């Protein structure tokens, strides 16, 4: 016999075979097993399924108490005695004192004190001990397993009750479900993650299987899209499936991706599970005021984040900066925030210690955003977010020009979602637009050197329309937009932008800017096939002494590009230019410059009959460039490398018609047909 407090049969479980086996194994060897996880992840469903199987195999009963919705006075202790169905007078009379012994001060029934004040009733150890003994005896006779379900609103009270029960009977088995652990030494915690949407390329995961039980297996790509938008949350999937009564699956996929499932509603056994909003609101009500503010302000962060970024966004007059880290950990403990990277890790490239990183799941983020908007704080939080991203971009720019460019690349990759949001969210005013433009300009190396040219141009073209005031920042943005246009072989657009940038640089007496403009013109002329004009522009750029080495390609890069331009024409001058490039470097960790210099040497040696030396230089250039990216350059080097290997093995190949076409136009091995594509996002 299984005594469920709500008398419902245990439900079926989808996609929890591993967790089911894990909980079953722990239940056989440990007295206390706690299932934790975010709201709606399926903790109660799995616990009931495991206990149903456990009692079917081993006999016995299950005493379930729904701590969130099933308590009607007296707390979990009295509810547990009621679930046991005790008719014994001693048990009934001692239930209330036991409840008082395990209750938080001020939670249980209050008694009047002097001057009309209220106080907690005095504990009654003898009666409490009697009730515990009676309950323990009942559990031994019936071989009962206790299930304290949804303990969050009375978690401390449940922890004291569990501790007393295990002291009374160490052989007792107790299963707890809550958004956070009880924190007892005897406790073994199983944390439930959302269901996987896919298990590999083309393989649907359990989240899709769960949705397909309602929709059928038609249009699997739409099922995957819906489950990805819902982040694999079982409750969100169930509520979304209920919407199919009033809309088609394609409509559901479009709506859930744009609007989110926060206010989807459907039938449920508890009020908390009738919508994601209700589920999140229940947890929000249990948080302290500080934790609520931090939760709401974190909702402006679209991606994962570290404590520094969280502090920038959340700290204010009502939330001290020192309090943010503690709030993050408390929110993580109750499964509002996910920790996606533990603290204490080591950067694989630099060996530097890595901070933890967190993530706010979509349901919690949508709920927090609604609370932020209701409190009238959304505008201020968004402004703080963009300012923090501007600081991140500036830090990345300095790291790029410093001793290790990989640090800059990793920083931008880690903060990709946040930087993208800071660049694309509509600015609130002119000052906010300048902040977004500053981010785009600071990330010049990401666009120009790491292969994201198309994205960079799109951001700059849009933001330049919003920032019309003639400032030094706008002058840099104009140069960068023209430089990217030249790299993408858009000569007309590049010419117009660089002309405007030249006027602004003259107005601001920016000699560094004039040198960068000459460098960009050289790129334009090289891709246009006018080597003489490119050499002239690069010679002008190399005569300049940079005053600001922290922005843009400096004289060293102009020397390296000059070596590439001269490689097929004048070997001695090309070698000299490559040497000057490395001599005038700003940092030994400039892999962008190093790979360009090596590639120039490879082209020079190849053009002047030294294929073996060219092969060595080309291979080193490829390895250096791989450290920072840029697929077009990498593809070009690989193409050159393949030709050099063929030459070394078999001698020079007979020329063909295609040899007259530059590699960036015809494409090397594995390159798309269109020129200067942008690097694909990881996992896309």
Tell what function each PLM region has.
Residues 44-51, 162, 280-383, 387, ...:
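C-terminal boundary/linker of central alpha/beta nucleotide-binding cores
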Residues 294-298, 365, 386, 392-396, ...:
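Short, well-ordered secondary-structure microsegments
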Residues 99, 124, 201-208, 212-213, ...:
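A eukaryote-biased feature capturing mid-to-C-terminal, repeat/solenoid-rich segments of large proteins
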Residues 24-29, 40, 49-60, 100-101, ...:
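A conserved switch/coupling segment of P-loop NTPase cores
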Residues 1-25:
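Conserved adenine-nucleotide phosphate-binding loops and their immediately adjacent elements
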Residues 4, 16-18, 45-46, 75-82, ...:
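Alpha-helical sensor/transducer elements of the RecA-like P-loop NTPase core
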Residues 3, 199-200, 215, 219-223, ...:
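Loop-to-helix "switch" segment enriched in basic
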Residues 437-450, 475-490, 513-530, 553-569, ...:
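Tandem amphipathic alpha-helical repeat scaffolds
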